[in-house]
Structures are given as C-alpha cells and as structure tokens.
C-alpha cells in the first residue's frame, strides 16, 4: 500500500495507525482469552510496528513526515481486567516516543489517547464483560444506565450532544476532528501527545 501511495502521489505525508481490538479479560480467563490476546498483540502493537516500517524510509528520504499512533488513556496505567490491552497501548506509547527521539527534525510523531469512542466495533472483542469493572470501577452501574439512555431517542439528555458539558462518549467524527487539528499544525510545530475524552465520560483514568 505504501508503494502504491508513492507511485500515485509521489510522497507519504501522514500515516495514521488506527486499527485495534480490546479483548478485556481477567488473568483467570487466560485459557479462554489466549487466542484473543495474541490477536490483540498482533493488531495493536505489531500492526503499528509494521505500519511505521512501511513508511519510515520514504519519510526520511522526503525529509519530513508525520506518524499518528492511536493509543489509549489506558496505556498510562495498569487496569484490572485489561492487562493485555493496556500493555499493547503502553507499548505503543513507548514506541512512539522512541521513533520521535530517533527522527527529530525529520518525522513528527503524535500519540493520540482517546477514552471511550462509540460507533466502533472495539467492544465486540471483549472476552469477559465483567472485566469492564477495571476501567469503570464504581461508575459501572451508572455507565450501563447511561448507555441505554445514549441509545434511546429522546432520553439522551445531552449525552449525545458534543456542545453539551454532559457529552458522554466521543464519536469517531469528533476524534477525527482532533486528529485533523494535530495534522494541520505547521511542520515546525509537533503535538506529540494528546488525550481526547468526552467532558461527561465515566472512565476512571
């Protein structure tokens, strides 16, 4: 794909590593979760490594480029029920900083750390739903209640409105807008780390 971009456009200005899955499970679930955990490592971490490798040399030859890696706020802290997912995102954080250090003045690197983003299939990979307790804690019951309201027309009470202080979950569109903001900075300005959350979200971190 990188070669096709170069062939058609002559350069690769930006790479966004966005693929990811979230197979939440406790260590006691390891037998049932093993395949999902291995896939998580392949997609969440190795996928980023392969993506960077595909564009690195071209960006260096060009003299400039921008790599945007989608991580997670949960790459910052250990979370019960999220060991493998959290570990892959922590690895992405360190990988991003390593690339930035090695490529200063040639490749800009941004790590984007969202909290919950609706409208994706991320939750479909959860192995044990009870493992969500680690990222929600005491908010788990009210989270479930708000999830129902969020999906019910007429009951969202501002939860779905990005202009409301109660906005409950970032949409893919809103997240994309923040990524565009990062990319649109002058080449000499690099936003290396950004956390994107809804002002009314209920995640612990």
Region spans (language model):
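Conserved mid-core segment of classical short-chain dehydrogenase/reductases
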Residues: 22-38, 61, 81
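Active-site loop immediately N-terminal to the catalytic Tyr-X3-Lys motif
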Residues: 77-83, 167
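Conserved amphipathic alpha-helix within the SDR
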Residues: 1-10
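Active-site helix of classical SDR
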Residues: 52, 88
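Residue(s) in the substrate-gating loop at a strand-loop-helix junction
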Residues: 72
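SDR active-site lid
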Residues: 101-189
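A short helix-coil junction within the Rossmann-fold of NAD(P)-dependent oxidoreductases
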Residues: 8-9, 26, 54-63
């Amino acid at each position: 794909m990188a070669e096709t971009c170069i062939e058609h456009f002559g350069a690769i200005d930006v790479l966004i590593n966005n693929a990811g899955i979230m197979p939440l499970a406790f260590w006691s679930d390891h037998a049932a979760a093993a395949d999902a955990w291995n896939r998580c490592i392949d997609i969440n971490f190795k996928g980023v490594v392969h993506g960077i490798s595909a564009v690195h040399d071209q960006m260096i030859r060009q003299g400039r480029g921008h790599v945007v890696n989608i991580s997670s706020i949960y790459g910052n802290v250990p979370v019960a029920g999220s060991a493998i997912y959290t570990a892959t995102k922590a690895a992405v954080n360190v990988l991003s900083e390593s690339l930035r250090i090695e490529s200063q003045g040639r490749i800009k690197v941004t790590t984007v750390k969202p909290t919950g983003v609706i409208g994706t299939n991320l939750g479909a990979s959860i192995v044990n739903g009870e493992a969500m307790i680690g990222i929600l804690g005491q908010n788990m019951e009210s989270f479930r209640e708000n999830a129902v309201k969020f999906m019910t027309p007429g009951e969202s009470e501002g939860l779905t409105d990005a202009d409301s202080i109660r906005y409950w979950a970032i949409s893919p569109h809103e997240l994309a807008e923040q990524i565009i903001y990062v990319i649109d900075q002058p080449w000499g300005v690099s936003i290396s780390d950004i956390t994107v959350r809804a002002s009314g979200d209920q995640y612990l971190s």
